[in-house]
From Swiss-Prot:
Compartments it resides in: Cytoplasm, Cytosol; Nucleus
Species, as recorded: Homo sapiens
Induction profile: Expression is repressed by CEBPA.
Enzyme class: transferase
Stored PROSITE patterns: SET, ZF_MYND_1, ZF_MYND_2
Zinc finger annotations (MYND-type) as residue ranges: 52-90
Family: Belongs to the class V-like SAM-binding methyltransferase superfamily.
S-adenosyl-L-methionine keyword on record: yes
Entry's Gene Ontology molecular function annotations: histone H3 methyltransferase activity; histone H3K36 methyltransferase activity; histone H3K4 trimethyltransferase activity; lysine N-methyltransferase activity; p53 binding; protein-lysine N-methyltransferase activity; RNA polymerase II complex binding; zinc ion binding
Protein name (record): N-lysine methyltransferase SMYD2
A GO cellular component entry from the record: cytoplasm
Amino acid sequence: MRAEGLGGLERFCSPGKGRGLRALQPFQVGDLLFSCPAYAYVLTVNERGNHCEYCFTRKEGLSKCGRCKQAFYCNVECQKEDWPMHKLECSPMVVFGENWNPSETVRLTARILAKQKIHPERTPSEKLLAVKEFESHLDKLDNEKKDLIQSDIAALHHFYSKHLGFPDNDSLVVLFAQVNCNGFTIEDEELSHLGSAIFPDVALMNHSCCPNVIVTYKGTLAEVRAVQEIKPGEEVFTSYIDLLYPTEDRNDRLRDSYFFTCECQECTTKDKDKAKVEIRKLSDPPKAEAIRDMVRYARNVIEEFRRAKHYKSPSELLEICELSQEKMSSVFEDSNVYMLHMMYQAMGVCLYMQDWEGALQYGQKIIKPYSKHYPLYSLNVASMWLKLGRLYMGLEHKAAGEKALKKAIAIMEVAHGKDHPYISEIKQEIESH
């Protein structure tokens, strides 16, 4: 299949950025630029039973695979369509039992290898960019990253050798490096992790901290919509990262994961940085050094919490959140993004513990500064309104709930498109209350 391209868009060489995607026609806010079916994808283990493994539909009463009892499907059709991928894991899951634990990256990479064998020619996901062309940044990997790739390769051999042939080690290193910087995480309307996937044409877009498009998902289909007006000849930019944080933090993240430093307007002017690291107005203002120390503390505690999530109890996690907020509040305003980060984590722990009132209190403190720090149409803001709306509804605050859900819908109609199933579901929630 020859690359027939995408209507109104072209691949081009973006100065200083390598390949990129450029508009050939105007797009208005909310317009769908293109959609891209997943080249390969995998449902995350924690969502098994909630979503169909094949089409990612979320519903009650899915049927389970009779062999492994681990995969769930809408019906026989979905199960049959998924078999070429599921068979890579079906009997190994039974054989390994409790010891079956490949990472999601390994699971996705196994599926890419299977797909390449089944479908060596170009796919409808690769109209402008083929998987083979993905950037790997091999020359930029440090030893730690190389070691991580080698352990992924070992796991790939360990769990998948019965049903898959592998290329040599060097080719696998390249493939894992490509997956690491071109893979996507699929999230639901509340930004909960659903799975991982490869969307080659979506991966063609370069990054900006003031993006003009947003990527959302409809099952295993990625959709790209304009969140700013785009004129013919303009490059199409998405954001690779969470845009909450100040410039230095964003670029640390971009360098670490994607090996470049951003030079967008936001990174050049740093316009939002002052508000993002808002300092308390005290009669004796904190010294520059005290501020620097507190920023360093904040970054460390964020990393500490990220690691602690894997082994600490909810109450211990909540304590980290509360103590760190207390410490930071001596220097930082509540609207400071480091404070917001810990509030957001605390809210997540409250939701996990089903402490709805606690979660609501955190959400109420978060939403206003979120709306200020994030771009106009932001999935982070939409999902926060949605969580708030559902909490209000659950706690019988109907008027506040409806108002919050409508705020979520207003953003989602642009980001997800007016006809997205998520929007119908939320409207249904408003109706039924």
